[in-house]
C-alpha cells in the first residue's frame, strides 16, 4: 500500500471525522462523519475535475472555487441535537434542546435554507442580528417546523422592532432580545402601534469571559447586554406595566470560540442564577428558555488543547453535557423548572461543510539576502555584540532610551532571523503563487491572523519536499500566507509538474464567516461556488450547482460605475478614434464577463 502523507498536514486531528486521504493519495470528504462507509467518501480531485470540465456551451468554472458539501451540514445538525438529547437523557433534565443558526455566520441562500430544511425535525431555527438578516430568516422559517425560534439580537431601531413584530403576526416564533434597557421602550411603542404582543428576552452581560481575541466582547466591559441588576430593573418595569408575561428568555454569549468546558459550565451556571432569580425573586413565571449563545468551537489546529484561539479541548458531547449539567444543578438548587435550552452554534455547524480550492500558478525560490546567508553562530555573535552596547553610557536619559530602543529592535530582527535560520536551515523556501485573494477568500487570516488547516488535494502518496509560503494575485504586500497551524511559517508542498495536471491546495474549515466578511481589494471578488451531494457507494456524487464567481462587470458595478456608460462606451469612443475597436471590443467583452482571477495559466516546470 502506498505511503499516506496526510499526517504531515495533521488531517487526523482537525479533519476528524470528515476529512481523510484515500488510497489514491487524494483528499476525500467523509460526508457522514464516522458513519461514512468504505467507498462512500467523495474524492475532492474528482469533484474539481468535473466542476471545471466545459459544459455544453464550452464554458467552464474558473478558480478559485468553494466546494460545499451539504451532507456534512446535515450531519453536523443531527450530531449537535444527538449530543444534547443524550446529555438530557443521562442527567434526567426536565426539558428539551432547541437551537438556532446565526444567519451572520454564512448568509448564503443555500446554506441558510439547508439549515432550516435539515433541522426541521429538531425545530431548528435562525438568529438574526440586523434587518436584512431578519428578512432572510422570516422567509426561510416559513418552511420550518412550527415553533422554531427566530431570535432577534443586535441593536434595534423602531423599524427593526416593527419588522420583528410583523414576523410574529405571521405566526413565526419571534423573540426580541433586548441588548439595552432603552430598547424596551421601542418594543412597547411599536407593539402598541401595531397591536401585536411581543415575546421578549434580555441579554445578560456575565462576569465569566474567555481569554484571547474571541473573548473581547464578553465580561463586564463587553459590548453587548445588561448586567444582572439592570435585567432585574427590566423585570420591575414590565411588572409595573402589567407586561411581565412578555419576558420569556434569558440570553448570554461569552465568545465565539470557548476553549474549554470549564468555562462553558461556569458561564451556564452564572446565567442560570440570573434565570432562577427572575423566576423566584421577581415573579417572572413565564420564563421558558435559556439561550446560551454561541461559543461551541472548532479545533482548527487539531491539537484538542484549548490553549489558543485556534483550538478547543472538547467535542459536541462534552459541550452539551457541560451546559445541561450546569443548568440542571442550579435550577434544582433554586427549585425552578428546567428551561428549554437554546444555543446559537454557527461556527461549529457551518465550518466543516465548505472548503476553498486554490490553484497553484507557479513556485519561485525565495531569494536570500546577505543576512539570511549568515550562519547560526554568526547571528548569535551579532546578538551578543548588540547586547554589549546596551550598557549604561554617559548619554542623557532620553538619548539612552532611544539608544536602547534602536538596538532592541535590531536584536528582535536578528532573533527572528535566527529562529527562521534554525527552522529552515538547509531548506530553500518557495513562494507558491496562488490564484487567490487573501482579502476576498480568507479575510479572517488577514484581519485577525486566524489560521486555517491547508493541504494539497492530490499527490498525498508522495512526500512533499518543498517548504512553501503562499502569495496571492493582489498588488498588496499583505496578500500572502506565511503562518500556518501548529505555529509554523511554511507548509510542505510538492514541486509543480505540468505533466501531472493542475496542483490544488485546499483551505479547510472555512464555511463560517469567510464569505460574509469577504472584501474586494483590487476588485478581486468572490469565488466560483460548487454544491456537491453524495449519491451512495463508490464515491458517487452529483454537482447540483456550479456558479461562476463574481465577474469583472459585476465588481466594477459595485463601486458606483455604470459599466455601459462609464466604461464600455468611453473605451469604445477612444478605440474607434484610433481605429482599433474591432480588436478592443472582443477583449473588453471577454474581460467584463469573466472573473478577474487568472484563467488558463500554465505553470512552468520547476527545477
UniProtKB/Swiss-Prot annotation:
Its Gene Ontology molecular function terms? arginine decarboxylase activity
Sorted alphabetically, which InterPro entries does this protein's record hold? Ala_racemase/Decarboxylase_C, Arg_decrbxlase, De-COase2_CS, De-COase2_N, De-COase2_pyr-phos_BS, Orn/DAP/Arg_de-COase, PLP-binding_barrel
Tell me which Gene Ontology terms the entry assigns under biological process. Answer: arginine catabolic process; putrescine biosynthetic process; spermidine biosynthetic process
Q: Where does substrate bind?
A: 290-300
UniProt-listed Pfam families: Orn_Arg_deC_N (PF02784)
The answer to whether keyword Magnesium applies is yes
Q: In which pathway does it act?
A: Amine and polyamine biosynthesis; agmatine biosynthesis; agmatine from L-arginine: step 1/1
Cofactor entry: pyridoxal 5'-phosphate; Mg(2+)
Q: Which UniProt keywords apply?
A: Decarboxylase, Lyase, Magnesium, Putrescine biosynthesis, Pyridoxal phosphate, Spermidine biosynthesis
Is Membrane tagged as a keyword?
no
- The enzyme's first-digit EC class, named in words, is lyase
Catalysed reaction per UniProt?
A: L-arginine + H(+) = agmatine + CO2
Which residues get modified to N6-(pyridoxal phosphate)lysine? 104
- NCBIfam families recorded for this chain? PRK05354.1 (NF003763)
Q: What is this protein called?
A: Arginine decarboxylase
What taxonomic classification does the UniProt entry list for its organism?
Eukaryota, Viridiplantae, Streptophyta, Embryophyta, Tracheophyta
Amino acid at each position: 500500500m502506498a505511503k499516506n502523507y496526510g499526517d504531515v498536514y495533521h488531517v487526523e486531528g482537525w479533519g476528524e471525522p470528515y476529512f481523510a486521504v484515500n488510497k489514491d493519495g487524494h483528499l476525500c470528504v467523509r460526508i457522514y462523519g464516522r458513519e461514512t462507509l468504505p467507498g462512500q467518501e467523495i474524492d475532492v480531485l474528482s469533484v474539481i475535475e468535473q466542476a471545471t470540465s466545459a459544459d455544453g456551451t464550452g464554458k467552464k468554472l474558473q478558480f478559485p472555487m468553494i466546494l460545499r458539501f451539504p451532507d456534512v451540514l446535515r450531519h453536523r445538525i443531527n450530531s449537535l441535537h444527538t449530543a444534547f438529547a443524550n446529555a438530557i437523557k443521562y442527567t434526567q433534565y426536565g426539558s428539551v434542546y432547541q437551537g438556532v443558526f446565526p444567519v451572520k455566520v454564512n448568509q448564503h441562500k443555500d446554506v441558510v435554507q439547508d439549515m432550516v430544511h435539515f433541522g426541521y425535525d429538531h425545530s431548528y431555527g435562525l438568529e438574526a442580528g440586523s434587518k436584512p438578516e431578519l428578512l432572510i430568516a422570516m422567509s426561510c422559517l416559513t418552511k420550518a417546523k412550527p415553533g422554531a425560534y427566530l431570535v432577534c439580537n443586535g441593536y434595534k431601531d423602531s423599524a427593526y422592532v416593527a419588522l420583528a413584530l410583523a414576523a410574529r403576526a405571521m405566526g413565526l416564533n419571534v423573540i426580541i432580545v433586548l441588548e439595552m434597557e432603552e430598547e424596551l421602550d421601542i418594543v412597547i411603542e411599536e407593539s402598541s402601534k401595531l397591536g401585536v404582543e411581543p415575546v421578549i428576552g434580555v441579554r445578560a452581560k456575565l462576569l465569566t469571559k474567555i481569554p484571547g481575541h474571541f473573548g473581547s466582547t464578553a465580561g463586564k466591559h463587553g459590548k453587548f447586554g445588561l448586567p444582572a441588576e439592570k435585567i432585574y430593573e427590566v423585570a420591575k418595569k414590565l411588572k409595573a406595566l402589567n407586561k411581565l408575561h412578555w419576558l420569556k428568555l434569558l440570553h448570554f454569549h461569552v465568545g465565539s470560540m470557548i476553549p474549554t468546558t470549564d468555562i462553558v459550565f461556569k458561564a451556564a451556571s452564572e446565567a442560570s442564577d440570573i434565570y432562577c432569580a427572575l423566576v423566584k425573586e421577581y415573579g417572572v413565571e413565564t420564563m421558558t428558555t435559556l439561550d446560551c449563545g454561541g461559543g461551541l468551537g472548532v479545533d482548527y489546529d487539531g491539537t484538542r488543547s484549548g490553549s489558543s484561539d485556534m483550538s478547543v479541548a472538547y467535542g459536541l458531547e462534552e459541550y452539551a453535557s457541560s451546559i445541561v449539567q450546569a443548568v440542571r444543578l442550579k435550577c434544582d438548587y433554586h427549585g425552578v423548572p428546567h428551561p428549554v435550552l437554546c444555543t446559537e452554534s454557527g461556527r461549529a455547524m457551518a465550518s466543516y461543510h465548505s472548503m476553498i480550492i486554490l490553484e497553484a500558478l507557479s513556485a519561485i525560490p525565495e531569494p536570500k539576502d546577505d543576512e539570511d546567508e549568515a550562519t547560526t553562530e554568526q547571528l548569535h555573535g551579532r546578538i551578543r555584540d548588540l547586547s554589549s552596547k546596551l550598557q549604561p553610557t554617559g548619554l542623557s536619559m532620553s538619548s539612552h532610551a532611544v539608544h536602547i530602543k534602536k538596538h532592541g529592535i535590531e536584536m528582535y530582527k536578528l532573533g527572528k532571523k535566527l529562529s527562521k535560520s534554525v527552522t529552515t536551515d538547509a531548506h530553500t523556501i518557495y513562494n507558491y503563487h496562488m490564484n487567490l485573494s487573501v482579502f476576498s477568500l480568507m479575510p479572517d487570516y488577514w484581519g485577525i491572523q486566524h489560521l486555517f488547516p491547508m493541504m494539497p488535494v492530490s499527490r498525498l502518496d508522495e512526500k512533499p519536499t518543498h517548504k512553501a509560503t503562499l502569495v496571492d494575485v493582489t498588488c498588496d504586500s499583505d496578500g500572502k500566507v506565511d503562518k500556518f497551524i501548529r505555529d509554523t511559517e511554511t507548509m510542505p508542498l510538492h514541486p509543480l509538474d505540468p505533466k501531472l495536471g493542475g496542483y490544488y491546495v485546499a483551505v479547510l474549515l472555512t464555511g463560517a464567516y469567510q464569505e460574509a466578511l469577504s472584501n474586494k481589494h483590487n476588485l478581486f471578488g468572490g469565488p466560483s461556488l460548487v454544491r456537491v451531494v453524495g449519491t451512495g457507494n463508490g464515491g458517487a456524487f452529483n454537482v447540483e450547482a456550479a456558479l461562476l464567481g463574481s465577474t469583472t462587470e459585476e465588481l466594477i458595478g459595485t463601486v458606483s460605475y455604470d459599466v455601459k456608460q462609464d466604461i464600455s462606451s468611453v473605451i469604445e469612443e477612444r478605440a474607434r478614434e484610433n481605429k482599433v475597436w474591432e480588436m478592443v471590443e472582443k477583449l473588453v467583452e471577454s474581460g467584463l464577463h469573466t472573473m478577474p482571477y487568472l484563467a488558463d495559466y500554465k505553470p512552468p516546470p520547476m527545477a
